[in-house]
C-alpha cells in the first residue's frame, strides 16, 4: 500500500510539474498596444454616457443615449433581450451578479436608446484577466452568445463603438464578441461553433413519437439498467458538482467553482434547476437547465464515463425535455458544439438543428492567426497534463484557472 501511495504521489507531482512548465513558458507582455478592429464607416462614440448624433440610415436627427450601467440591469433589460430575434440566455441580466460575485470580473453592460421610443440595444460584457494570455473584454464569458442585440443596426453600431472604447481605455489585449448574427466589424468571425435548437411540441407523448427508434431504445435501456432521475435546485448542487468535477478532469478542462453554480441557482431562482441521474443511490450524471424567454437551455451537463454504457445521459435529457413540454416551453437549446463532433452527433439525434454562432476576436497581435495557433497548442498540452491530476487537486486549483478562461 505504501509503494502504491508513493507511485500515486509521484504521478501527481509529475503532472503538476508538466502543467506548471507549460504555463510558465508564457509570460504576459507587460505593455500591449490595443489595436481594436474598427466598425465599418461608423464614428467612434465619445467617452461620456450620452451623445447626440445623426443615425446613419435615418432622415431625422436622433439622440443616442449610449451608457454603461453602474448597477445590475432592471426588468427592462430582460424585456428588450427576450423581444429580440437574437435573444439568448447570455443576455440575461442575472449574469451581471453571478459572474461578478462568483469570480470578481468587472461587468460592462452597455445600452443604446433612441429618442423615438424604439427598441433599445443591449450589450453585456465582462473584463477578464486571462493570465497568461492578457486581459480581454468578452461578451459573454462562459456562454455561447452575448451581444449586441435588439434595436436597429445604427444603434448596435453605437453600442459596439462604446464597448470598443471601454476595452481600449482599460488596456485590454483582446475583445471577444459572441453573436447569433453577423456584426458590422472589419474582421471575419470564427464559424467553428453552432448551437443546437429543437422546437418542442405541446405534450411529451408527441415528442416521444418524434424521436428516432434508437433514441427511444437507449432511454428504455437506461431505465432497465436501474437509472433514475431527480430534479431539484440547490439541494442537488453537491451531487451535480461531484459528477461535473470528475468529468471535467477527464476532459482535461479546469472546473468551474461550486460557488459559480450556487450563485447561478440563487440568482435565477425558480427558472433554474439541477437534474441528477442516479444508479441506485449514487449520482452518475447531472445537468443545469435554465429557462429564459421561451427557451430552455442546458449550458452544463456531465456523466461519469464508467457508467456511460447504462445511458444515463439519455434518460437525463429525456426527463429534461419532457418537463419542458409540460411547462409549455417553445424550444430547447442543447448548447454549443463543433460540427461533426461527438457532442454534435449526440444533440442532433434528438432532432436538434444547427444555428450558426459568430464569434469575433480582435487583438493587438500583428499575426492573430499565429497567436491563436500558439494559444491552441498551449491549451492542448495543458489539457493533457490536467487529465493526469487527481480530482481533489483539480477541484482545489481548477476554479482559479477556469475563471480566467472565457470559453
Each model region followed by its residue ranges:
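Short catalytic-loop micro-motif centered on adjacent basic/acidic residues
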Residues: 176, 231, 331-335
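Aromatic (often tryptophan-rich) hydrophobic motifs at membrane interfaces
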Residues: 109-114, 132, 143, 154-166, ...
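Active-site/acyl-donor-binding loops of N-acyltransferases
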Residues: 16-19, 26, 34-61, 109, ...
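Acyl-donor-binding surface of acyltransferase catalytic domains
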Residues: 2, 6-12, 16-55, 139, ...
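Short loop/turn motifs at secondary-structure junctions
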Residues: 106, 171-173, 328
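Conserved acyl-donor/pantetheine-binding loop and adjacent beta-alpha core of acyl/acetyltransferases
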Residues: 127-145
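A conserved beta-strand-loop-helix scaffold within acyl/acetyltransferase catalytic domains
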Residues: 64-117, 125-133, 179-192, 198-309
Amino acid at each position: 500500500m505504501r509503494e502504491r501511495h508513493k507511485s500515486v504521489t509521484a504521478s501527481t507531482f509529475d503532472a503538476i510539474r508538466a502543467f506548471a512548465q507549460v504555463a510558465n513558458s508564457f509570460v504576459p507582455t507587460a505593455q500591449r498596444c490595443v489595436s481594436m478592429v474598427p466598425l465599418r464607416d461608423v464614428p467612434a462614440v465619445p467617452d461620456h454616457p450620452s451623445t447626440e448624433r445623426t443615425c446613419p440610415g435615418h432622415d431625422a436627427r436622433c439622440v443616442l443615449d449610449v451608457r454603461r450601467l453602474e448597477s445590475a440591469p432592471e426588468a427592462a433589460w430582460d424585456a428588450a433581450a427576450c423581444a429580440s430575434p437574437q435573444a439568448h440566455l447570455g443576455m440575461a441580466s442575472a449574469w451581471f451578479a453571478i459572474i461578478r460575485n462568483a469570480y470578481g470580473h468587472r461587468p460592462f453592460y452597455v445600452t443604446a436608446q433612441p429618442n423615438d421610443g424604439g427598441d433599445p440595444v443591449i450589450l453585456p460584457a465582462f473584463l477578464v484577466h486571462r493570465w497568461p494570455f492578457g486581459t480581454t473584454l468578452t461578451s459573454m464569458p462562459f456562454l455561447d452568445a452575448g451581444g449586441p442585440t435588439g434595436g436597429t443596426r445604427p444603434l448596435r453600431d453605437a453600442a459596439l463603438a462604446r464597448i470598443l472604447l471601454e476595452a481600449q481605455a482599460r488596456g485590454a489585449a483582446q475583445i471577444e464578441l459572441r453573436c447569433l448574427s453577423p456584426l458590422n466589424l472589419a474582421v471575419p468571425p470564427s464559424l467553428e461553433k453552432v448551437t443546437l435548437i429543437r422546437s418542442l411540441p405541446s405534450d411529451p407523448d408527441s415528442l416521444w413519437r418524434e424521436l428516432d427508434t434508437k433514441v427511444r431504445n437507449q432511454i428504455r435501456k437506461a431505465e432497465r439498467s436501474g437509472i433514475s432521475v431527480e430534479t431539484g435546485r440547490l439541494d442537488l448542487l453537491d451531487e451535480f458538482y461531484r459528477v461535473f468535477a470528475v468529468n471535467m478532469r477527464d476532459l482535461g478542462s479546469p472546473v468551474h467553482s461550486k460557488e459559480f453554480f450556487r450563485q447561478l441557482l440563487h440568482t435565477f431562482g425558480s427558472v433554474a434547476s439541477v437534474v441528477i441521474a442516479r444508479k441506485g443511490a449514487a449520482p452518475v450524471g447531472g445537468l443545469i437547465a435554465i429557462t429564459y424567454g421561451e427557451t430552455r437551455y442546458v449550458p452544463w451537463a456531465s456523466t461519469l464515463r464508467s457508467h456511460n454504457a447504462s445511458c444515463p445521459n439519455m434518460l437525463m435529457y429525456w426527463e429534461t425535455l419532457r418537463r419542458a413540454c409540460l411547462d409549455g416551453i417553445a424550444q430547447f437549446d442543447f448548447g454549443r458544439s463543433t460540427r461533426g463532433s461527438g457532442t454534435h452527433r449526440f444533440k442532433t439525434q434528438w432532432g436538434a438543428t444547427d444555428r450558426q454562432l459568430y464569434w469575433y476576436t480582435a487583438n493587438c497581435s500583428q499575426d492573430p492567426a499565429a497567436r491563436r495557433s500558439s494559444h491552441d497548442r498551449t491549451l492542448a498540452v495543458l489539457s493533457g497534463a490536467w487529465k493526469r491530476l487527481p480530482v481533489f487537486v483539480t477541484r482545489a486549483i481548477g476554479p482559479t484557472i477556469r475563471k480566467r478562461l472565457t470559453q
